[in-house]
Curated annotation (Swiss-Prot):
Organism in which the protein naturally occurs: Caenorhabditis briggsae
EC primary class: oxidoreductase
Family: Belongs to the acyl-CoA dehydrogenase family.
Protein name from the UniProt record: Probable medium-chain specific acyl-CoA dehydrogenase 2, mitochondrial
Catalytic reaction list: a medium-chain 2,3-saturated fatty acyl-CoA + oxidized [electron-transfer flavoprotein] + H(+) = a medium-chain (2E)-enoyl-CoA + reduced [electron-transfer flavoprotein]
Subcellular location: Mitochondrion matrix
Positions contributing to substrate binding: 152, 263-266, 383, 394
Amino acid sequence: MLSRLARTQISRSALLSQTRQLSFDLNETQKEIQAAALKFSKEVLVPNAAKFDESGEFPWEIIRQAHSLGLMNPQIPEKYGGPGMTTLETTLIVEALSYGCTGLQLGIMGPSLAIAPVYIAGNEEQKKKYLGALAAEPIIASYCVTEPGAGSDVNGVKTKCEKKGNEYIINGSKAWITGGGHAKWFFVLARSDPNPKTPAGKAFTAFIVDGDTSGITRGKKEKNMGQRCSDTRTITFEDVRVPEENVLGPPGAGFKVAMSAFDMTRPGVAAGALGLSWRCLDESAKYALQRKAFGTEIANHQAVQFMLSDMAINLELARLITYKSATDVDNGVRSSYNASKSASQRIPRIRRLLMLFRCNGFNSEYPVEKLMRDAKIYQIYEGTSQIQRIVISRMLLGHVAQNGTSRM
């Protein structure tokens, strides 16, 4: 359905021209895409969120529905069978799905991080095979970089690869791999130069590894604080043989490939936090209009009004930053600066929401308790809040040193 919307009366070239200019208004096609995603979110995700949170079951049926509507992997180009949507359009979908449930959203859009390095560094054969498969079927792919001793410090990756003939042999373990139990293929980063003094930019090689390759062991599903239906596991590689044609980008350039993916995907992470915050504001306002204290609805108390107004202001500011970062990607500009600003500010506002609900917010009968648990991960993945601040400060200082101003 959304594939057709993306090809309506506005041509793709004209649409790209419009989305590549900062605008405070969405065009009609973007509004239709957003409305369709939000309709699916409210009708399918919201009613099922608590069930999947409790069971921890992977939401295959919902994933299949999302794929049939064009809501899964919408950024895959048309030439590989996808809808060919822009980053901004994809961001609108992530925001709308996250309004319903960020765990279910991650089940649907989780392959995005694995897609990015293939899109950036893959050759035509790799893109046709692996992006084409994701466009054709509701399957999962995983970004397989984090290790037990290497999270934000990607240079600390210990998984190694050794070239033998026309193959590479991979050995090592990866941790916290989203979708790891169901992935048809993995993006894997491994150290190809054993010399610890070799710069990161030359020490690692990136691979596409098929999920059914001999030597891959998928660990148990982790029991996480939030987003419980998302499948997170340890993946172990023991003498895994990968053909040379599955090297992604030049040998030794894997670190750059892995890091470049974040510039494409951070707007989506920010959009996930944004959709959750949007839901928080809606739940807060509805509760304030219903709950009574001291003889009137709590919405009539100034302290509550201040809380709601602060949430509304911060939400709209985050939305503008997130949309700007998505527009930056469509414009070929690094998005980390703006996306990092948006992704690093979520949890304090969720805490205020919990305070508004008081004891009811501490109880699972109300949605706030789950929203609080689901929100925490946004301070961690694709760079902790502290790492996001480092990214922001480095880009800021570099820009001032070069241009004499902080204005980007």
